[in-house]
UniProtKB/Swiss-Prot annotation:
Assembly: Component of the FERRY complex composed of five subunits, TBCK, PPP1R21, FERRY3, CRYZL1 and GATD1 with a ratio of 1:2:1:2:4, respectively.
Lineage: Eukaryota, Metazoa, Chordata, Craniata, Vertebrata
Main location group: cytoplasm
Cross-referenced InterPro entries: Fy-3 (IPR019311)
Keyword Protein biosynthesis appears in the UniProt entry: no
The protein's role, per its UniProt record: Component of the FERRY complex (Five-subunit Endosomal Rab5 and RNA/ribosome intermediary). The FERRY complex directly interacts with mRNAs and RAB5A, and functions as a RAB5A effector involved in the localization and the distribution of specific mRNAs most likely by mediating their endosomal transport. The complex recruits mRNAs and ribosomes to early endosomes through direct mRNA-interaction. Plays a role in mast cell degranulation.
One annotated Gene Ontology cellular component of this protein: cytoplasm
Pfam family, one: Fy-3
The name this protein goes by in its record: FERRY endosomal RAB5 effector complex subunit 3
Coiled-coil spans in chain: none
Keywords assigned: Cytoplasm, Endosome, Phosphoprotein
Cellular localisation: Cytoplasm; Early endosome
Length: 552
């Protein structure tokens, strides 16, 4: 279709106009390139002036020129449309992709499907939300968010049940076909059925994906409008009934907090906390925590609304627009997507609750992909310039080849950031790219993963992130090669490097007190955990405790 369009765009036609001056018959010939971008009136004026044409043909020439441009443009559009239809019929163009593009264009340009005009939420909504979350209406907001979360969770549960039933049904069908393989059916029949099953799963997943996307969009719009309206109503001093309603509202979820907490209690976490001092001249004090926990536990919401759960959620909401943000580090591969591993698990957690303040995780990743594509393009052009400049250094040439080899992916040590308001205890996720080298036992302080941690801590200093959770062993799951000596060496390396980075931080931000949480996988033993806990005071200068006793 693009080729056809280019052919018509480059077409040149000759405009012929015949007129008579006295007894002499004259003819004006002007080549025009279509589509004509210039205004017909302007073009007519230029022709009159350029060719010194008599004034009595001015009106007739203008009509003839306008008619010629209109007829030829219409003919081009008709030919272009015919070529596009032929491309669709011949299979040159993907019909499903074309239909999706048309549906999107129709929804974006048709008034019936257009969203109502909204104020700029970015600043107004942020200020309004910050005021309300620090007012008696805070629990009302959290209760509404929790109701929305339960609604989306139920929708996701229905999706999972339907997908499970489809896979079970397809499994039974495939078993029957495999039993007949070689008798009445061939490999081609099996492949055809497998393709049908895959297409059915894709259609069902797309259907539920669109439904979830629509539901979250509706929830987000309703929530923002409700927050703005509530803020306006609270400004009215005569609205006492609303104030009473807000004060009474919070108690509705408290009746079974303790029982629900016991029912949904997770695997017991191990935790040790330390207060440390860094620096000799410019002394700074920080909090360190060592935890045995799943990294995603800091992201997941719970269906119950117990007091402990609500406290964490309230703290996260209170600090959303503050200078005390919370972040965590996820170790990911070099592809910017959410299709596999912990990336998929994290995206699933993000989808369980509507984000009322930031774009969806998929939209944020699309922006990251565009930025990464631009950065990779710049990197490739610089590598090409370095080669063309005649630099014969072998090491430099290897680096250039390595950059080209990784042209479509980010490199180990690089990271991208996503923002969230819908996660349990964090606001910012650092997606740090690592490779299989982190599983070896010979990485050094100059390893890309370690340098990536340094850059992440620097971003924390410059962007008000005062709490950061780091995987201590630079892995999320244990494997056979990760023996006790391996764990001790890796923990010592990360502890010492982070200590050095935190001392650097004092010069970056003036010595603001921060909390660094070191997480180890849940599969690690208690004995190993306490060995790591005993190692920490040997590397960091831990504050001594004072015991106060009363004299009788």
């Amino acid at each position: 279709m693009k080729k056809n369009r280019e052919r018509f765009c480059n077409k040149e036609r000759e405009f012929v106009y015949k007129f008579q001056v006295g007894r002499e018959r004259l003819e004006l010939r002007v080549p025009l390139r279509f589509p004509v971008e210039e205004n017909a009136s302007h073009l007519h004026g230029r022709l009159m002036l350029l060719h010194s044409l008599p004034c009595f043909i001015e009106s007739d020439l203008k009509d003839a020129l306008s008619r010629f441009i209109e007829e030829e443009s219409l003919r081009d559009h008709d030919s272009d449309a015919e070529a596009c239809l032929e491309a669709v019929k011949s299979g040159e163009v993907d019909l499903h992709q074309l239909a999706s593009a048309w549906a999107k264009a129709y929804a974006e340009t048709t008034l019936e499907h257009a969203r109502p005009e909204e104020p700029d939420w970015d600043e107004d909504f942020a200020d309004v939300y910050h005021d309300l979350i620090h007012s008696p209406a805070s629990e009302t907001l959290l209760n509404l968010e929790h109701n929305y979360f339960v609604s989306i969770s139920e929708l996701i549960g229905e999706r999972d049940v339907e997908l499970k039933k489809l896979r079970e049904r397809q499994g039974i069908e495939m078993e029957k076909v495999m039993q007949e393989l070689g008798k009445s059916l061939t490999d081609q029949d099996v492949n055809s059925l497998a393709a049908q099953h895959f297409e059915s799963q894709q259609d069902l997943e797309n259907k539920w994906s669109n439904e979830l996307k629509q539901s979250t969009a509706i929830q987000k719009q309703e929530y923002q409008e409700w927050v703005i309206k509530l803020h306006q109503d609270l400004k009215n001093p005569n609205n006492s009934s609303l104030s009473e309603e807000i004060k009474v509202q919070p108690s509705q979820f408290r009746e079974s907090a303790d029982a629900a907490g016991r029912i949904y209690e997770e695997q017991r976490k191990l935790e040790e906390s330390f207060t440390i001092h860094l620096g000799a001249q410019l002394k700074t004090m920080h909090n360190l925590r060592l935890l045995r926990a799943d990294m995603l536990d800091f992201c997941k919401h719970k269906r119950t609304h117990g007091s402990g759960v609500k406290l964490h959620r309230l703290q996260t909401a209170l600090s959303l627009y503050s200078t005390s943000l919370c972040g965590l580090v996820l170790l990911v591969d070099n592809r910017i997507n959410s299709y596999s591993g912990i990336k998929r698990d994290f995206a699933t957690v993000c989808q369980e609750c509507t984000d009322f303040h930031f774009p969806r995780i998929e939209e944020q990743l699309e922006v990251v992909q565009q930025v990464a594509l631009y950065a990779r393009t710049q990197r490739k052009s610089k590598c090409k310039e370095a080669r063309d400049s005649g630099n014969q250094n072998g090491g430099s040439d290897d680096k250039s080849k390595n950059a080209e080899r990784n042209y479509l992916n980010i490199l180990p040590g690089e990271f991208y950031i996503t923002r969230h308001s819908n996660l349990s205890e964090i606001h910012v996720a650092f997606h740090l790219c690592v490779d299989d080298n982190v599983k070896s036992g010979n990485i050094t302080a100059r390893d890309p993963a370690i340098m990536g941690l340094r850059n992440i801590l620097k971003v924390c200093c410059t962007h008000d992130i005062t709490t950061i959770s780091i995987p201590l062993l630079l892995v999320h799951d244990m494997s056979e090669e990760m023996t006790i000596p391996w764990c001790l060496r890796r923990a010592e390396l990360v502890f010492k490097c982070v200590k050095g980075f935190m001392m650097e931080m004092a010069s970056w931000d003036g010595g603001i007190s921060r909390t660094v949480q070191f997480l180890v996988p849940q599969s690690i033993s208690e004995e190993m955990f306490y060995q790591l806990s005993n190692m920490l005071p040997q590397i960091f200068r831990v504050s001594s405790t004072l015991t106060l006793t009363s004299k009788h």
